[in-house]
């Protein structure tokens, strides 16, 4: 029964457990069968030559790196938004539309860092991108087809972003306006060190029912962001907050016929792709909501930094993607396929930061980049991933781009940096809880 309940919350829309080509594995075998045939491959195996003391020394060296000492008063509030299915499909191929579906984000330049994430999932498995961001660990060195939230995170994880920020005096609140049981978030967020979890299950404690806005079937981004800003409004004086928001507005599928929002239309493709157009219309709604959030934060009287990023591209019509590519998906090389795994991100602050554009990275490095930008001290994992990022700036479950921008398939990888990463990740996910961690977990109950 527990398995059935868990699986009922998984967004299986045109996705599967095969990280090389999730869409085709699903169509060939079906989602449940794809899950079944990969289960045997998902167990963590000790890396070749692994020694726990070597990993501990590696992390100790990373932790000892000199960092700027920052007064708590100078540290900003931190908002991280993982926006459901948020992507710019123009990365796949030339896409022309009746209007800009991301006008505000495209216009942002001041105090703004924009770029591209290389993610592992397509059309689903949101939790894997989320896992990478919150832990600094990578799907690229885990067994193919892994779902860490369901397999590997079963004890207190003191190296997560919320746990680290808790040590720095932050209050950490997760906001996800959907069922808390999905992807086991109710349990995972507790183990990750969040102090509070606002989900659809308890949303009426935080907001009047009449104030909850829906777009199609899901809580809107505007409402989701309002739950975030309400936390800022109601926090204690001097309290620093980390707010992690996983949105729902743009979740698939894209066949809603209520007509409650204007439609962005595609103008340069031969086919008529209603799902893709509905999706693009939703992205424009997200862009509007983000503009409202930034406007609010501009007038907020405490330094605050926000990052927004997507989890995966949407599973809209296969024919749409094939026309963008100019060829059948079955004819794509693994490197060509990576265009379906590239997602935008934006970092903005209501104070001066150095602006950048077209920065290429991955979700596992994004929290490190965020803390660097915010001038917040980092832990040993974040320092370690900073070093790996120099050699492997982008990584996903299929391979990585090296420092020269060359694609390296996972089966062809010989990177010493990734060997170390795999050892660190194995250690982090298999280590035993110490006494302090067990006591901390008990205190959070």
PLM regions with names:
Residues 30-73:
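Helix-hairpin-helix/helix-loop-helix acidic hairpins
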Residues 22-34, 123-124, 219:
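Membrane-interface micro-motifs in multi-pass membrane enzymes
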